[in-house]
Amino acid sequence: MKINKYIDHTLLKADSVQSQIDQLLSEAKTHEFASVCVNPGWVSYCAEALKGSDVKVCTVVGFPLGATTPETKAFETKNAIENGADEIDMVLNIGKLKQGDYQAVEDDVRAVVEASGDKLVKVIIEACLLTDDEKIKACQLSVAAGADFVKTSTGFSTGGATISDVKLMRQTVGPEIGVKAAGGARSLEDALAFIEAGATRIGTSAGVKIINGEAVKGGY
């Protein structure tokens, strides 16, 4: 198993500076990670730096709260793709989901899917804020709206990915839709356990340490 190809090498901190982004890019190219996941302001820089490599540029939309309008998320998506993004990790409207406004949630995801063209869309459901029934519904609505992946977490709320959430999400979406575990992998063993549970992508800021079998303290 090539664990590196499961990893979205991630740097989403507000205080990220260019030297840190450069390190992220260098590590991603060296270890041939699936993607780098960065804030939208870094997309064009990363896209230019990764030309000629297989590493994708992933960015975030409606991040981290999911509480912007569908129109705003669609604009963010189009702008990110114009700047060179290959993959979009969007946050669904969590409040609308919790109050049972399911059509609004589906329409919100669909707005991003339609704006994304042929680019990959991952829907962050922020599982730590949801009941199991809400997690199932969030996954079902994401699939109905045409998403390619469901993702556990932003890394900016009360918790990251858990094995039980990944299993539940995989059971809900079936074998054809991707599942991304984010914010919970602290070791190679963790990453392998998430993959065993059904994850097809791992979002982490510690990809290098994970593939080298080193322990990770803190971080995303």
Swiss-Prot record:
**Could you name the active-site residues?**
D89 (proton donor/acceptor), K151 (schiff-base intermediate with acetaldehyde), K180 (proton donor/acceptor)
Listed under GO cellular component are: cytoplasm
Taken from the record, one Pfam family name reads DeoC
Q: Which subcellular locations apply to this protein? A: Cytoplasm
**Family annotation (CDD domains):** DeoC
Record function comment? Catalyzes a reversible aldol reaction between acetaldehyde and D-glyceraldehyde 3-phosphate to generate 2-deoxy-D-ribose 5-phosphate.
Alphabetical list of HAMAP family matching this protein: DeoC_type1 (MF_00114)
Q: Which family does it belong to?
A: Belongs to the DeoC/FbaB aldolase family. DeoC type 1 subfamily.
Q: What is this protein called?
A: Deoxyribose-phosphate aldolase
Q: Which organism is it from?
A: Streptococcus uberis (strain ATCC BAA-854 / 0140J)
**Source organism phylogeny:** Bacteria, Bacillati, Bacillota, Bacilli, Lactobacillales
